[in-house]
């Protein structure tokens, strides 16, 4: 059984027991939250698509921790002009465990 869930403008394919990195949610570690924005649900080769969400479907998650990803560096150099730009970016994320998918 798996589900497609919407969180922070992105879509994630999740199964029970998975550990997923969502965008920062500002929640306490060990807290449990229910997500109601389930776009699709598949169990026993039976696919249920929502319009836009599946009615009555919930996903229970447990927050593990909040962290920051490794730095992604972008570097641009223009040849023969002594011009260059270097920027770094670190994404904030929340690591969660999928406890239960209920339909």
Curated annotation (Swiss-Prot):
Keywords: Ribonucleoprotein, Ribosomal protein, RNA-binding, rRNA-binding. It comes from the Bacteria. InterPro entries: bL21-like, bL21-like_sf, Ribosomal_bL21, Ribosomal_bL21_CS. One of its GO terms (biological process) is translation. One of its GO terms (cellular component) is ribonucleoprotein complex. GO terms for molecular function: rRNA binding; structural constituent of ribosome. Part of the 50S ribosomal subunit. Contacts protein L20. HAMAP family: Ribosomal_bL21 (MF_01363). This protein binds to 23S rRNA in the presence of protein L20. Belongs to the bacterial ribosomal protein bL21 family. This is Large ribosomal subunit protein bL21. It comes from Wolinella succinogenes (strain ATCC 29543 / DSM 1740 / CCUG 13145 / JCM 31913 / LMG 7466 / NCTC 11488 / FDC 602W) (Vibrio succinogenes).
């Amino acid at each position: 059984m798996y589900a497609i869930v919407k969180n922070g403008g992105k879509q994630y394919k999740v199964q029970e027991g998975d550990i997923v990195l969502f965008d920062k949610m500002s929640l306490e570690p060990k807290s449990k939250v229910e997500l109601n924005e389930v776009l699709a649900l598949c169990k026993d080769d039976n696919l249920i698509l929502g319009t836009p969400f599946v009615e009555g479907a919930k996903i229970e998650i447990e927050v593990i921790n909040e962290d920051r990803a490794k730095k992604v560096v972008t570097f641009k150099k223009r040849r023969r002009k002594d011009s260059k730009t270097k920027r770094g970016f670190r994404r904030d994320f929340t690591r969660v465990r999928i406890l239960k998918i209920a339909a």
